[in-house]
Amino acid sequence: MSIDRYHQQFTVSWDQLHRDVRALCHQLVERDFQGIVAITRGGLIPAALIARELNVRLVDTVCIKSYEHQDQGGLQVMKGIDHDGAGWLLVDDLVDTGNTARAVREMLPEAHFVTVYAKPEGRPLVDQYLTEVAQDCWIQFPWDMGVAYVEPLVDQVRSRDS
């Protein structure tokens, strides 16, 4: 899938991510999890934040590569896991088309699967999510961005007009 499928952009700041993860944790706080499995790389930071909020000390990873920048390609399992997920919380930043989610569900069919953000195509594959975003929306996560100087608007307009 190419960048052409994205017509909107949603930028998530660090503050927004913390608020969203904490809100998701409010839905999970009554449950008792043996551990957390983060889907790398996108699920690492949400999993760390969730582990802190739920006081879960055991965190593992399943490593699947599915994106090259904004192009979604075939799945490559780089590290699997040796249990069915019973009693475990499975965490990713988002579910998009569901390709990664399907593969991980096969590996960990008994895990409780949560994502912070969900798109319509992948939403049925997770047990819980916090925020739904449009299928054609590219989500910019804070770990993918840097701070850069932006020229004042008046200077941008003047340089464009000259």
From Swiss-Prot:
Keyword entries, A-Z: Cell inner membrane, Cell membrane, Glycosyltransferase, Magnesium, Membrane, Metal-binding, Purine salvage, Transferase
Molecular functions per Gene Ontology: guanine phosphoribosyltransferase activity; hypoxanthine phosphoribosyltransferase activity; magnesium ion binding; xanthine phosphoribosyltransferase activity
Necessary cofactors: Mg(2+)
UniProt subcellular location: Cell inner membrane
CC per GO annotation: plasma membrane
InterPro entries: PRibTrfase_dom, PRTase-like, Xanthine_Guanine_PRibTrfase
Chief place of localization: membrane
Pfam family, one: Pribosyltran
Catalytic activity: GMP + diphosphate = guanine + 5-phospho-alpha-D-ribose 1-diphosphate; XMP + diphosphate = xanthine + 5-phospho-alpha-D-ribose 1-diphosphate; IMP + diphosphate = hypoxanthine + 5-phospho-alpha-D-ribose 1-diphosphate
Binding residue positions for 5-phospho-alpha-D-ribose 1-diphosphate: R41, G42, D92, D93, L94, V95, D96, T97, G98, N99, T100
Membrane topology classification: Peripheral membrane protein
Gene Ontology biological-process annotations: GMP salvage; purine ribonucleoside salvage; XMP salvage
E.C. numbers: 2.4.2.-, 2.4.2.22
Residues given in the record as xanthine binding sites: D96, I139
Gene3D superfamilies referenced in this protein's UniProt entry, alphabetically: 3.40.50.2020
Pathway the protein acts in: Purine metabolism; GMP biosynthesis via salvage pathway; GMP from guanine: step 1/1; Purine metabolism; XMP biosynthesis via salvage pathway; XMP from xanthine: step 1/1
Annotated positions binding GMP: D96, T97, G98, N99, T100, W138, I139
TM segment ranges: none
Sequence positions that bind guanine: D96, I139
Amino acids binding Mg(2+): D93
Assembly: Homotetramer.
Family: Belongs to the purine/pyrimidine phosphoribosyltransferase family. XGPT subfamily.
Role noted for this protein: Purine salvage pathway enzyme that catalyzes the transfer of the ribosyl-5-phosphate group from 5-phospho-alpha-D-ribose 1-diphosphate (PRPP) to the N9 position of the 6-oxopurines guanine and xanthine to form the corresponding ribonucleotides GMP (guanosine 5'-monophosphate) and XMP (xanthosine 5'-monophosphate), with the release of PPi. To a lesser extent, also acts on hypoxanthine.
Name of the molecule in the record: Xanthine-guanine phosphoribosyltransferase
Gene (name only): gpt
